[in-house]
Design a protein with these regions (language model features):
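A charged, aromatic-enriched C-terminal amphipathic alpha-helix characteristic of glycosyltransferases
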Residues: 404-438
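Non-catalytic membrane-proximal stalk/linker segments that position and tether the catalytic domains
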Residues: 3-80, 86, 120-123, 443
Length: 443
């Protein structure tokens, strides 16, 4: 019996297994049965382990009828725009859900949220349920109790899919009509592989294959997949050619530049800079060490404005430089967009769509970016501004050329605006998202 059951039950995160053992519910020799109990008896165990018998909601002010499809959206945290890291895109998805004939709920799974209803509703739609008290322990109990309630579950980010993979398979067996939508955005393993190559510590061929196999396995439970770009869609399609894959990118509203060429003088970098090993921190440090000194020799009047949360310890030396200004989190970026002559995106490894690049382009700021980002954006007209990160001298000269050449600056400014107006409109994102739900008979 044990053998047959174990074949049917997918793995449960080790953290939950340990909690069961620590509570004395099971002995260590019964660890395999912990997996079974977590799924079969999730209601009991979830409440016992978390002490969370009731889930507090911020309930929707108004809902559609009971016959409307019920869709649960799971991401790491409440998707405030200032967080970056894909959260602005999640906020747009919430906005779209709020406009459809569905009853939507949202769970910020990874980070506790103590924001008041008024705070939540000032940033997000008020006709969505926000289940703020759920966490990585109580989610299993909740999903078990609601196993016959939801018609679709949207899961964002690979680590969330990995964490919930086992219980999602169980829910699919219990309710075959349930639709699982995996908002993968991109294959993150390729970023990790590129990161190690960039740092001069490449993974072995076997390690690369293992990472790819592990991540692509997460897609197997999905009835539909979201990618953020056509290039990411092609990568995923290589592994799952028969699963519907929709490009759900982002929407950005374009703005004609407030200031012209001669009223601008700064370089601008925007991004979250809290983690030392993040692509943003790596790229900024590389730029400031390898590129910025050469730019300053040719443009001594230039300053570098850095906007975004910046708590990474590796940034401390940069904060002492007079020519580099850290401005922290800013709710409004208009002032910085208006002052910037050149936007820099020196990313050396990444996956997905760089929303900060789209934001700068939407304000008519020419961008100097690495080939990594240029490829992700599929931005052929901007090819002259895509520089391999190892070519530091070329990156420097491209920055200086845009800074000094008014005609070239105007040309690149207009090309960026045209690209945003054709590739990142609200209508395109709305239609792509709605079509994806229609394909699953959810609308």
């Amino acid at each position: 019996m044990q053998s047959s059951l174990l074949k049917k039950i997918s793995k449960v995160p080790l953290s939950l297994q340990k909690k069961i053992l620590q509570k004395g519910i099971l002995q260590k020799r019964d660890l395999s049965f912990a997996k079974i109990l977590l799924l079969k008896c999730a209601s009991y165990l979830g409440d016992r382990l978390t002490g969370n018998n009731n889930c507090e909601y911020i309930r929707a002010v108004q809902r559609n009828g009971e016959e409307a499809p019920k869709i649960l959206f799971i991401d790491d945290r409440m998707p405030y725009d200032f967080l970056g890291a894909g959260y602005p895109r999640s906020r747009v998805i919430l906005n779209i859900l709020s406009k459809l004939k569905v009853n939507a709920s949202f769970i910020p799974l990874g980070f506790a949220c103590n924001d008041s209803p008024s705070m939540i509703h000032s940033h997000f739609p008020d006709n969505i349920d926000y289940l703020l008290s759920l966490n990585k322990d109580s989610i299993f109990s909740f999903l078990y109790k609601k196993r016959n309630f939801f018609d679709a579950i949207i899961i964002s980010r690979p680590h969330n899919m990995e964490y919930l993979y086992g219980v999602l398979k169980y829910l699919k067996r219990y309710k075959p009509s349930l639709k699982i939508i995996y908002d993968a955005e991109a294959l993150i393993c390729y970023r990790e592989i590129l990161k190690q190559e960039t740092l001069g510590q490449p993974f072995s061929t076997e390690k690369q294959k293992m990472l790819i196999d592990q991540e692509k396995a997460l897609f197997s439970v999905a009835d539909s997949i979201y990618a953020v770009s056509p290039s990411e869609k092609k990568l995923i399609q290589n592994y799952y050619p028969d699963t519907p894959i929709s490009v759900i990118s982002h929407c950005v509203e374009s703005h004609q530049p407030i200031n012209g060429f001669h009223k601008r003088e700064n370089f601008l970098f925007i991004g979250r800079l809290n983690e030392n090993d993040s692509p943003n921190v790596d790229s900024l440090i590389w730029f400031c060490q390898e590129i910025w000194p050469s730019i300053r020799k040719q443009l001594p009047q230039a300053k570098l404005d850095i906007v975004g949360l910046a708590e990474a310890s590796q940034l401390k030396p940069l904060k002492n430089q007079d020519d580099i200004n850290f401005h922290g989190r800013q709710d409004c970026l208009d002032e910085f967009y208006a002052a910037a002559k050149v936007f820099i995106a020196p990313t050396r490894f990444a996956a997905g769509i760089p929303l900060k690049v789209c934001g700068a382009a939407s304000h008519g700021i020419p961008i100097v970016m690495t080939e990594v980002l240029l490829t992700q954006l599929d931005w052929p007209k901007y090819s002259s501004l895509g520089v391999h990160w190892q070519q530091s001298s070329q990156f420097t000269q491209t920055c200086v050329k845009i800074y000094n050449d008014e005609e070239y600056w105007n040309e690149m400014s207009q090309q960026g605006l045209e690209y945003i107006n054709t590739q990142y409109t609200k209508e395109q994102m709305y239609r792509s998202f709605v079509t994806s739900l229609e394909q699953l008979n959810l609308l």
